[in-house]
Structure formats: structure tokens, C-alpha cells
Amino acid sequence: MEAALLSGFIKAILPRLFSLVDDKHKLHKGVKGDIDFLIKELRMIVGAIDDDLSLDHPAAAAVQTLCMEDLRELAHGIEDCIDGVLYRAARDQQQSPVRRAVQAPKKLQRNLQLAQQLQRLKRMAAEANQRKQRYTAAAPGQHGQVYSSAAAQVDEPWPSCSSASDPRIHEADLVGVDADREELLEQLAERQPEQLKVIAIVGFCGLGKTALAAEAYNRETGGGRFERHAWVCAGHRSAREVLGELLRRLDADGRSFHGDSDAGQLCVDIRQQLEKNRYFIVIDDIQTEDQWKSIKSAFPTDKDIGSRIVVTTTIQSVANACCSANGYLHKMSRLDKNCSKQLLSKKACPERYSHYKQPDSAAILKKCDGQPLALVTIGEFLQANGWPTGPNCEDLCNRLHYHLENDKTLERMWRVLVRNYTSLPGHALKACLLYFGMFPSDHPIRRKSLLRRWLAEGFVEPLSSSSNIDSTAAFNVLMDRNIIEPINVSNNDKVKTCQTYGMMREFISHMSISQNFVTFFCDDKFVPKYVRRLSLHGDTVVNGDNFNGIDLSLVRSLAVFGEAGTTVLDFSKYQLLRVLDLEKCDDLKDDHLKEICNLVLLKYLSLGGNISKLPKDIAKLKDLEALDVRRSKVKIMPVEVFGLPCLIHLLGKFKLSDKVKQKTEVQEFLLKGKSNLQTLAGFASNGSEGFLHLMRYMNKLRKLKIWCTSSAGSTDWTDLREAIQQFILDEKEANIGTRSLSLHFSGCSEDAINSLKEPCYLSSLKLHGNFPQLPQFVTSLRGLKELCLSSTKFTTGLLEALSNLSYLQYLKLVADELEKFIIKVQGFPRLLRLCIVLQYPTFPVIEEGALPFLVTLQLLCKDLHGLSDIQIECFKHLQEVTLHSGVTPATRQEWVKAAKEHPNRPKVLLLKSVDTAESEHTDVDSVMEAVKSETTEYSIAPEGPEQVNNKMQLDHGLESSSVLNKQNNFADQSSSKDQLHYSFNNMGLSDVSCCE
């Protein structure tokens, strides 16, 4: 594990080492020679590490660990050297010519120090390489390697299971699975349709997928419903091995099986065994789509027989592939509080203590996070440590990340976590996962902010290439593998906030500490060695004594949650910071900004606390890519910000300075088209700012949010109209990409909007204001896929005009009421998601055959009565219905009944809104509560009412596939009940895609 992460880190710093050879740094010839040596040496080290990783087993654990420590120290030393040169070069560029002349002697001295530093690094590289060769060569074994049980623990695959029972989870451990089991058994027994049906069970490791499949298998094999049945494990096996095992189980006599048969022949033999028989096959732990593609051709698809295949997998895209045609996808959910407590108590408390008052287990239940395997193994661990009379949960929790790796009782849980980590393809994904350690365990993490921080750290690239992954792709892979979970998902199916599971968080903490990846200061727990990423959270204020001997100048990332103290907030001690997250720092003040503006390598900056004004010196941050002031009190954005050459994302709600009316360097910068700004979300305007003239020169702007504010002098909105017109102008390019506009125009004249003209292009539009008719430019928009409108009332004419938007995929309407309107067969031909939020239940009439591709329907009105004449059986692709949580129980029951009678059996969900429609500072605005359509009882908020407004998450999970693999043809997915599972972030308008 350490080797892979280190190899990736060295690969990441090599390009920066190359940059030092560039003539612009004016290094001495001898210094350049030393840098060339280090480049070649690091390449060889990376090659040696990659060779070790490519073998079937790692090198001797002790030697390998020491070698990795040597190389990590070397790599960090090289990175410090590189960034030190870049830092000094950036500071020199900001000095006047006179100042640079005065500093010339000091520069010569620095060059001498650099030469000495490079010589030291050369010696370190040579010595580390020699030690590695000397001691690994001395270790006997295959390929000159030695193996240990500790190393084998990491890479040894799961034992293949030869029966239907899961060797890791006994039947006695099954708690809270009744509803899942009944749903699965119903899918197996369902007679319509009669052709082959594939049921995919998907979820994070340890949620009980195999145990659930085993429950169904054991019941069905004894029932006589199926003529042939078999169970095989696919984990860590080739398709040929899986097919061979399956054939052995089907052919009791062994006459059909030949050990030298290839996959194609095995498929033929299996088909002969299964043809014209009703069969039930379980394939446990499928890991790739290619593996499934090679296996599935072995199964006959005879009609009028009704065979069933159940597959289990941890990977969402694999589950989607398995049940893409006539399939059913079952997403595993975690146990609720009561079931979690029951399972933990069963495993932790010996029978002789059944009447003993058990200690408070809240802390350990939070760590287990409803994961059955975690509850079982932690329960056994507690019992081994004397529960309930021994140490309390709090004490054991504090060192749980240590016990995970070192305690035999927790070995099963540790192996699951290690497997998830080591299976990630490439070093970048491992670094991205470990970066979650920067956040407190119960802190929702904003996806876009996270991606920008990954970019600032250099883990990923802005765009994918043959050798590097981009930030969005990295996030999607982690989602696809169910390693991270979405908490809050916007109406248009975009993940807004996420977090990791409880035990995965413990694993990340352990790995981050052991790899010196993140240093934590949390409730007085501080492990100083050298600090590259520093995260402070808890109620403890850091004072100077805590930081004795710690060099803060090497910190690359700093995040503060709570109070930091004067020592941490002394930014004169930092030099190499790239990421600075202070939006939740309680003791941040305007005075701190002076030194922050000297952090010339800074790429990501988020501010909160009591910050009310940005200084002009922010212009020094030439490398800054993202500036987020949404949680601050900044009301005026200094014009100097718009002159930052690397700035891509500017977030907040601010007014713009009028100083650009005067000729300035910023104005000249913008006029030359040098701005890289892509996101401006957003600013408040009264239509008269001189800045609006310059927006036309922001050629790369892709996301714009504007609040129109009325004032005494705001009678002429010409400048604002022209700025918007320029932004939406259609250049008639084949692929413009995404372009989003969010416009709150209640404070300005409607003429400013109605006078916008074609040709125009937007992919997403949000309009908030009063408009009796649809603005003309909306109907002429090319590329419009997402539209969100908010007004007091929508007229029939406006609604009919909307139905002609032929490319619209998502529509959200928020109003008090709608005039009478019929959605006809020809209307909204490509609409996938429809959300209507009303005060009064004036929903439209939907003709039979209309909305042919609708996947999700959200009817959010607490006074909704029954089905409101909406016949959901007409929506052939419907996967989900969402209602306001305030509807009556009778209305809920009607929708549950209708959903159960629908061929797709769509989910029925309740949305409980939080009144934060216009809040720019709310991480999570709402909570989705699932109603299990299989029962008459509503499983609403199983985590208890006290957590509804805190955790804000889906108890029944959600499919990351919708983020990863957008399917254009939903016809292939019509029978997959849980293929797309969404949540929505509030009933207001701040969730549309053009908003942050």
C-alpha cells in the first residue's frame, strides 16, 4: 500500500523537478546537472517500486516499509526544494527593480544554499537506492523476494466459497434484513416477465450482500421452484475459472467438464446443461464488466421459463451492466440505529451478562455506521476486551484505527478496507481517497470544493490524459465503488455533498497518519513529525506549546473547523501553502488577510468567519484558481480579484466595484482577453456598474449567477442586458459545452429579460421573478437541457410554450399555483425528470403516452390529494416518485399501492424540506426519507428524529451510476427498479445546476 502511494507521489513531482531546469529560473549549470541526476534517480526508484508491485507478492514487509520511509523522506525533500525555489521566484517577481537589485547578494546566497541542498538530496537518493538493493537482494524467495504473513494479509484474496453460505457472516448475525429478503424473494417468484431476469445486489463491502443472496438461495433451493441451481464465487478469478466452477456444480457426473476448455467452450457446455430448465444461479462478487460479459453468454434466455440469476458486487457500474436488460437492481442499505444496537449487543455481550446494564455504545455505533460486518467484528473485539465490564467504548474508539490493523479480532474488517484501497487503479485515486482525512468524520464534504482542492494539490489534472485522471473521473470512480456515499443530491441528479463510511473513515485516518499524509490536531491529539497537510477540528485551541519544533513553512494544505488559535493563524510562518480552507474557522479576522496575501503559491482559498473586506493585496496571489467567500461577510469584491491570471472559480454574493470605470491594470488585463474565469456565482447588480462592460471580455465564463437589485438610480438596465446577451450568445460552435445562467430578476424591469434576442445558447437556466409569459429568448435557446422557473403563478400560455422545448431533460417549476394545463403526447419529448413545487395542488393533466422517457416524478405539495388523476403506469421508464412529507397517510398509501402495481415498482420517497431556498451557506438543505413500497408500514427516518436535520442523508442509499454513466437510452433499463435513485437538496431554487 505504501509503495503504490509513494510511487504516485514521485511521479507527480517529477514534472515540477523538470520545471526547475527551465531557463526562467536562471540556475547555475552545475545546479541543473544535479537536478538532472535527481530526475534520473527518481525515475529508477519509481521503476523499482512498480516492478515490486507488479509481482504476485510484496517484498519482505519490514525491509519494504523501511525502504518506503527512506524514499518518502527523499521525495518530500525534493518537493520542498522545488517548491522553495518556486516560492522565492514568485516573491522576487513581485518586488520592484530597485528592491531586486538590493536583494541580489541574498539571492546569490540562496543559490549557494540550493546547490548544497541538491548535493544532500543526491547523497540521500544514492544511499536510499543502495540500501534498497542491498537488503532486498539479501532476502531469499521467489524472484529474490521474501514473504511474510503480514504482507500476505493485504494481497491474499477472499477464500472462495463452495456453498451458499457466506463464510464471513453466520445466519445468527442477520439482523434487520427481513424487508430486503422479502423483496428479493418477490423478485425471484415474480412470474412477469417470464424470460431470464438478472438481479444485481450492490453496496459497499460488509453490508451483507452475500448473506442476503445466501438467504434467498437456501430458501429457493429447497422449494422446488427451480430445476437447476448453483452458487459460484467470482472474486479474484478469471471468467474461465468462474465458468469452470459453475459447470462442475451443474454437472454432478463431471462428464461435461474438461480442464483445458476455454471460456467459449465452457459457455457452450453450460448452455447445454441449462437449456429448457428453470434455473437459479448465484454469482458472488463480480468485479468487472468484462468478467460479466464473458460469463453471461453461458446462460440461455429461453422465454416462458422464468430463470433467475443473482449477482453481488461492490461496483455500481458492474451492477448496472448485469441488470441492464430486464433486470432488477437492489441497493443495500445500512442498518438503522435499533438494528445496529441489537447486532452489536448480540456479538459484544456474553450471555452471562445479558441482564447486566450495558455501557453507552453511541460512540462505537457511530464508528460502525450501520455496517453489519463492522458491527459483528467490533462486537467480537469488545467482548474480547471484557465488555460490558471492561473498558468503555469511548476508550476503545479513540484507538480504533490502531486496533484495526493490529488486532486479530478485527482482521476481517481490516481486510475489507485494505481490499477497497489497494484495488483502486492508480496512485491518484489513493491520494484522493486519503484526502478525505482532512475533514471531520461528521462533516458533509462539498463535491465541487473537494475537486478543486484535489486539483490544487496536484493529485489530478484538469482534463484526463493517457497518463492522468481528471478530478471528476476520480470522484466518479470512488462513487462507483461505493467507497464514498452521496449525502445530498440536487434535483438534476448532481451529487452536491458526500462523505465516507464510518469504518472507511477510520482506515483513512490510520493510513493518513502512517503515511504522514495528513497531520491531525483534534481534541488535543497531535502527532507531530513533519507537517505537510494540517487539519484542525474539535474544540481545542492550538497554542504555541503544541507547535514547538514544528516547521509550518512546509504545510501544503490547512483546514480549520472551529477555533485555531494565534499560532496556527500566524500566516507569516507558512510559505508553501496551496490549499487554505478557513470558511469554518471561528477566530479568523480581517487582520489575518495581510499575511495570507503573501502566500504566493496559494491555489485554493475559502474564507468565512468575520472576514468582511478583501484587501487590494489579494492581487499578489497570481496562482489562485478558486476563491470562495460564500461563508464570509464580504459585500464588495475588489476589482483586483478580476486581474488574477489563474482565477477560475469566484464564489459568493457580492457587489462589484465601480473603480473599473477608471483605466486600470485590471481593465487592460480584461480587455486583452487574459481572464481564465469560468465560474462567477455570483454578484448583485443594479444595472449601472461599469464592470458590466468588461464581462464581454471574459471569454471562458461558463457559469454565471446574478441577483438584480433595485436602487434609486437603477432605471437603466441596458448594461446588464448587454452583459447577459454577450454571455448567452450562440457562437454556433459544434460543441460549446456547459453554460449555465442563474438570474434573480425580481428587482429589475422585465424588459431587461424580454429584450434578450437570439441566437443564444445555454445548457442550464434558472429564472426567479414574476413573468406572466415565458421570455422569448428561452424558447430559442439552443442546447437547453435543464430549466428551473420560480414565480408566483404560471399561466397556461407559459406552460404550453415550455412544452415545445424539445431537448429539455429536466424541468422544475416552483409557484403558488399553476393555471389549467394539459401535457400532451407531443410535449416534452425528451424529459427525464419533472419536479413541480406548489402551495396549492393545481397539478397539470398528463395525457396517456406523454412524457415517454420520464424517470423521476416529484410532486411537492403538502395538500396533494391521492393520485391527482396521474396514471403512473403510463410512464414506462419511471423509477422514482417523490412526494412532500406533509401529505396525508392515505395519499402516501395510494402512491405506494400504485408503485407496487407498476411493472418497474418505482421507489416512493418523501421529501422533508428545510426553509433555506435562498441560503448560500447551507451544505445540506433537505432530507429524503424512504417509504418501502413492499410494506404498508412507512420506514421514515429510521435513524431517529433527532438526526433528521443533522445527518441529512438517504437511508436507502442512492445510485452513483447516474453520475458515472449517463444512459441516453433508458429503454434498455426499463425494468431495473432501482437503476436511478435520486435525492433533492431543497424545495427552493438554489439547487439548480447553475448554482454552486
From Swiss-Prot:
Keywords: ATP-binding, Coiled coil, Cytoplasm, Leucine-rich repeat, Nucleotide-binding, Plant defense, Repeat. It holds the Pfam family NB-ARC. LRR repeats lie at residues 481-503, 504-528, 529-549, 577-599, 600-621, 622-644, 698-722, 759-781, 782-804, 805-830, 851-874. GO terms for cellular component: cytoplasm. Residues 111-138 form a coiled coil. Residues 180-462 form the NB-ARC domain. InterPro entries: Apaf_helical (IPR042197), Disease_R_plants (IPR044974), LRR_dom_sf (IPR032675), LRR_R13L4/SHOC2-like (IPR055414), NB-ARC (IPR002182), P-loop_NTPase (IPR027417), Rx_N (IPR041118), WH-like_DNA-bd_sf (IPR036388). Belongs to the disease resistance NB-LRR family. This is Disease resistance protein RGA4. The gene is RGA4.
